[in-house]
């Protein structure tokens, strides 16, 4: 299983945000994007997720079953700044919608198990809008667990989380990688992960590569 981006360029309005960005991730690997606001982190994530058309370049996901090339959007979870949940629906109703929309009903954790995995068991009957900002973000992560997809694309995943939730998030990502998943994340702070690739976005000037470990 591989996720490959080659010579990507993207615009915001009339302006080029970045050019010639390439990376390659195999099963069990993660790439963390860092850089100042406006440097193109979120734009790159949206391009890889298939939510924004690149100015040039290609993104290919190749699965391990017959080595079929697919667009990453067909095999990925995208978690943006917003949680993509309806406040008036219960937690269970929100998660059930995403499970049906994103994957096979049996290819993921049951709803209560997913809620327990993010430390919020016993609240799936509550309206999503009743939850605190931190609880809402945790439930957004439960969405990744109820429908299995091998690629996680995460934009500032620690937003609204406290230190204990940060650690829980790191554990979830580590477990996903250990199972052969791929993670592409943008953040302003370390995610508590070991031996992951790092790409520092510097806007149109380019990117710098490194490794956190």
Indicate residue ranges for each PLM-predicted region:
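Catalytic Walker B motif of ABC-type/P-loop ATPase nucleotide-binding domains
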Residues: 152-156
